[in-house]
Amino acid sequence: MSEHDMQNTNPPLPPLPPEITQLLSGLDAAQWAWLSGYAWAKAGNGASAGLPALQTALPTAEPFSVTVLSASQTGNAKSVADKAADSLEAAGIQVSRAELKDYKAKNIAGERRLLLVTSTQGEGEPPEEAVVLHKLLNGKKAPKLDKLQFAVLGLGDSSYPNFCRAGKDFDKRFEELGAKRLLERVDADLDFAAAANAWTDNIAALLKEEAAKNRATPAPQATPPAGLQTASEGRYCKADPFPAALLANQKITARQSDKDVRHIEIDLSGSDLHYLPGDALGVWFDNDPALVREILDLLGIDPATEIQAGGKTLPVASALLSHFELTQNTPAFVKGYAPFADDDELDRIAADNAVLQGFVQSTPIADVLHRFPAKLTAEQFAGLLRPLAPRLYSISSSQAEVGDEVHLTVGAVRFEHEGRARVGGASGFLADRLEEDGTVRVFVERNDGFRLPEDSRKPIVMIGSGTGVAPFRAFVQQRAAENAEGKNWLIFGNPHFAADFLYQTEWQQFAKDGFLHRYDFAWSRDQEEKIYVQDKIREQAEGLWQWLQEGAHIYVCGDAAKMAKDVEAALLDVIIGAGHLDEEGAEEYLDMLREEKRYQRDVY
């Protein structure tokens, strides 16, 4: 039977009713494509492709959907974005949820409604997972976004000069590229819960109303793909930390070192807490009792005076010890305190944002009280303070090696201000005040943006300075425990070989056992000319390029303000020189490594 005969055996199709013809004439290309796919799917499933089904399924508008993106450094932005997505789905809105590390930056051009929750790192830079999108939007290949509606929630820390800078930058750039705001940007501080909840409620109400105007059919409730779920880490979390015991506190810098770095071991037995190399440990701490007494004496407040803190009525001394931030000054504190001090100099400082930021960075809260005395009630003073927040430390152990323990590498923050010795809140608690077998409240903070390759045969290059070596100890422990075939290369820097070689004997043993294949050390103060890790990177350009050609993953951990930037500049020089690419090509190559998760950074 010929093809012509086969065609003639089918009965003729009835003509389309006028109302269907009218509807079809108004469809654009995207709607025609959708309709074609829908009809084909219906026919393939054995459903009738007749007109009644077509009439029922025919859309009168594009499906109303929202993309919710997060760019997180410590997990807070991800958590807020997850809740926002859940809230929108509960309102019957179709949601596409993604972390920026899993999102193709070029897809931004096709978005119609976008919510972005982003933190800020370093000196106002976007989180690592947002770098590629940030560069695209600010580069010469930036797409037009005139069909996009958006809203941005920024998370930050007001004690830093560039508060919520990443959120502000994205918000501004979206508008410059033609996008329209759904809602004004919100900048949330460390105690972000109330601001984030209000933003989520407002955007959900707005989008629900817009969806109704578009007569969109509410989307069915859907379970997000398994890959987007946060893996359970046991019942303990930031809000309900595990009361762990301190096993060991060992100073691992020499007596003559300018640094005080501690190797901390904590017992997780009975917690069911699990972590992976690259994760961080959240540590809740109490302030120094001596600092609490100093502050109360300066203010003339009776330690037994009761105030509200953490939903309880507590003596102010207890409240300041466990519920309020006392070691990190903020612009909000200085501005709030200035009227009580009634001092012209402090008023001038508070009125000039640039001067204020410098003052906040250099002057602890207690020293503000010393320099500008004032009398406040206990409630008034507490009202100027932020809630105490846990500190996050890169985990320096692998559970494959240490079992129910977790190890940290903690640099104790110590300095003098106007002759008075000061120490960091959490680092001082761990280094000085927490006794062996004492209790420390902890939780695991996942960091999926800083992971070993899934293929353990892939080589890795680890670049860090100071306590930035911490996660690399965990990496090599894990690779050794798995007897991984992949080569490991450590590039580490610190001031002095004799005083600051963190975990020296362990690195030597790893090398002897065949799990540290290459190593380069930069001791910046051991010779007249300062040598840093970026110098070692340039020195080893040909070798690094060869490892990259073999599929190596590069990891950087340490200071975001200077070290990480200098390392990236050195890597670009390697790509230009050894890879024979121009500057633009080198940038694109590094962006490709980022998107392939072969260039990951944990910087702070």
Swiss-Prot record:
Needed co-factor(s): FAD; FMN
Organism of provenance: Neisseria meningitidis serogroup C (strain 053442)
The name this protein goes by in its record: Sulfite reductase [NADPH] flavoprotein alpha-component
Binding residues for FAD: 327, 361, 391-394, 409-411, 424-427, 604
EC number: 1.8.1.2
All residue ranges annotated as the Flavodoxin-like domain in the record: 66-204
InterPro entries on file: CysJ, CysJ-like_FAD-binding, CysJ_Proteobact, FAD-bd_FR_type, Flavdoxin-like, Flavodoxin/NO_synth, Flavoprot_Pyr_Nucl_cyt_Rdtase, Flavoprotein-like_sf
Keywords: Amino-acid biosynthesis, Cysteine biosynthesis, Electron transport, FAD, Flavoprotein, FMN, NADP, Oxidoreductase, Transport
Residues annotated for NADP(+) binding in this entry: 524-525, 530-534, 566
Residues that, per the record, bind FMN: 72-77, 119-122, 155-164
